[in-house]
């Protein structure tokens, strides 16, 4: 008897997580628009193109209105569902927001074109999903709740199945296993999806990253065990810290009961479109070749690749690279102290930065970040395990008030105050939401917008001039080579004496516009926190960067 056909569905991530993972979310809307007509004809289940770090990056780095991007992509995708990633009560920011802000953001997201909202909480605290789920259902959107997958003693198949059942009961239309670190290995995926399929009746989706090198094999086992949908990225923006390649996974399932049935010819044309963009990113340094390989440390230390990169960056800033393995050993201990949270934004940054502080200060929790304090106070929600009471007491003090309810229950409505603060810069209803998430960044954007984006125009002019110069150089006639027998008669140049001790160049000799040095944020557009302290009299600065 022939095996029953169960075509796997494809969610394409090249317009969101693909470029977020490989080029720090720097793909511009203008680079997306020319190809979306072809993408719309492929037969994707959905295209993930908004949310996550794209919102912050548009405002902070690209001088783009993220709402404008959403509207333009909606206009182009006539037949394909559009999907976004939503951090539950954190929306797309790095703190909990009042319910009225969450509800309004969901309303405007769906009104502007989003069909599917993938909602996850960093702690897997389902209370933090409630408002976003209800708001999405009210607006007629598809609710996809996501399980933040991680490893550790409490995180059993039974735990994940219980979580999935809670999500189904609260109204989820589908559930995604969100493996942000690439930790789920193939045969474990078989067990997990078989159990999930027996527990819930709604569709199941798998999201992973290729960081550890196993994601494509994990997808195969997950699909065979009942997974209905997989996240993939077009090959120019796949692999490494991104997802498995769309073309490869589609070809893998061809001719099997799981054949996706999408247009493979169109996929090749789409890959051809994105390939020059990738090459441009490599040439400019925007895409670091290091993020394209397999990082086996992800499996060894059970932490996301982006978190490892962030740790290296922090230690390099403090000239303490030799402490890297000490910090890696400290991470599991800190994670245990803080209730064993999944290592995804913002908990991955909280755990990682606190581990760095503990090692560099030579005493555990001598200095605690404000985010560590907030987590221990219960401001982010409930962790899978209780906090270490001694650590909680040391960090917060004896009489600290601990939050045990849903954290957002304690946050009063924010929208009226936010509208007042935006004031004259409000040009559209959505502006208040941009300001709510990133007040300073959004206000800078509003002012630039009001002035006609002069800085953006100057950058674009300079980029056009540089491109024209490169084209001219490429098309210029080749220079005649000087015969070798002539070269030996050319006198050697005088030695360069630029680095003369004690020499200070005059102001006019220093080239304008040199970039300032700073900590790299390879997997994110911004930081959720920063601060400082001192070690043996030397200053210590820390920054927390977004990973997912």
Question: How does the language model describe each region?
Answer:
Residues 40-58, 292-297, 306-548:
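Terminal or standalone catalytic/regulatory effector modules within metabolic enzymes
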Residues 10, 18, 39, 119, ...:
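Conserved, mostly hydrophobic/aromatic
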Residues 238-260:
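C-terminal helical cap(s) of enzyme catalytic domains, especially alpha/beta-barrels
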Residues 155-167, 212-228:
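Catalytic cores of alpha/beta
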Residues 51-168, 175, 185:
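Active-site beta->alpha loop and helix N-cap motifs at the rims of alpha/beta catalytic domains
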Residues 5-8, 43-45, 78-82, 113-116, ...:
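Short, well-ordered coil/turn segments that N-cap beta-strands
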Residues 1-23, 70-75:
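N-terminal amphipathic alpha-helix/helix-capping segment at the start of soluble metabolic enzymes
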Residues 119, 179, 225-242:
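Glycine-rich phosphate-binding active-site loops on the catalytic face of alpha/beta enzymes
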């Amino acid at each position: 008897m022939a095996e029953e056909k169960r075509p796997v569905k494809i969610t394409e991530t090249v317009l969101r997580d693909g470029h977020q993972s490989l080029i720090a979310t720097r793909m511009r809307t203008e680079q997306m628009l020319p190809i979306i007509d072809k993408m719309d004809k492929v037969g994707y289940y959905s295209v993930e193109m908004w949310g996550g770090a794209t919102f912050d990056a548009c405002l902070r780095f690209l001088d783009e209105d993220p709402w404008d991007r959403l509207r333009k992509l909606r206009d182009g995708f006539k037949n394909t569902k559009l999907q976004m990633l939503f951090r539950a009560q954190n929306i797309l920011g790095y703190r909990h927001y009042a319910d009225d802000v969450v509800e309004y953001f969901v309303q405007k997201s769906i009104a502007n074109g989003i069909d599917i909202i993938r909602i996850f909480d960093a702690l897997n605290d389902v209370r933090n999903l409630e408002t976003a789920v209800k708001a999405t259902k009210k607006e007629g959107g598809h609710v996809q709740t996501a399980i933040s997958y991680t490893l550790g003693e409490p995180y059993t198949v039974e735990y994940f199945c219980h979580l999935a059942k809670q999500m189904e009961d609260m109204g989820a239309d589908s559930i995604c296993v969100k493996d942000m670190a690439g930790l789920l290995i193939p045969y474990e995926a078989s067990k997990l999806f078989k159990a999930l399929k027996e527990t819930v009746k709604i569709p199941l989706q798998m999201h992973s990253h290729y960081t550890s090198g196993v994601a494509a094999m994990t997808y195969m086992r997950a699909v065979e065990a009942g997974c209905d949908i997989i996240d993939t990225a077009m090959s120019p923006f796949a692999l490494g810290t991104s997802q498995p390649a769309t073309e490869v996974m589609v070809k893998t399932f061809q001719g099997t009961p799981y054949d996706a049935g999408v247009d493979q010819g169109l996929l090749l044309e789409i890959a051809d479109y994105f390939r020059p963009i990738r090459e441009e990113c490599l040439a400019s340094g925007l895409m670091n070749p290091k993020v394209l390989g397999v990082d086996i440390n992800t499996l060894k230390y059970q932490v996301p690749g982006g978190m490892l990169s962030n740790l290296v960056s922090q230690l390099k800033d403090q000239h303490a690279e030799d402490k890297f393995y000490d910090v890696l050993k400290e991470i599991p201990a800190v994670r245990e102290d803080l209730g064993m949270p999944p290592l995804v934004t913002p908990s991955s940054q909280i755990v990682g930065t606190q581990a760095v502080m503990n090692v560099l200060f030579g005493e555990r929790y001598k200095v605690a970040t404000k985010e560590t304090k907030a987590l221990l106070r219960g401001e982010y929600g409930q962790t899978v395990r209780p906090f270490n009471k001694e650590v909680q007491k040391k960090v917060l003090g004896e009489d600290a008030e601990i939050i045990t309810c849903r954290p957002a229950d304690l946050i009063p409505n924010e929208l009226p105050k936010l509208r007042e603060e935006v004031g004259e810069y409000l040009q559209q209803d959505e502006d208040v939401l941009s300001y709510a998430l990133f007040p300073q960044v959004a206000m800078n954007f509003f002012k630039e917008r009001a002035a006609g984006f002069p800085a953006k125009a100057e950058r674009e002019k300079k980029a056009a001039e540089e491109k024209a110069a490169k084209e001219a150089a490429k098309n210029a006639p080749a220079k005649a080579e000087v015969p070798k027998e002539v070269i030996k008669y050319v006198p050697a140049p005088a030695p360069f004496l630029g680095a003369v001790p004690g020499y200070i160049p005059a102001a006019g000799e220093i080239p304008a516009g040199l970039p300032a040095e700073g900590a790299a944020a390879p997997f994110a557009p911004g930081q959720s926190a920063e601060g400082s302290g001192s070690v043996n009299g030397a200053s210590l600065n820390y920054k927390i960067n977004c990973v997912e």
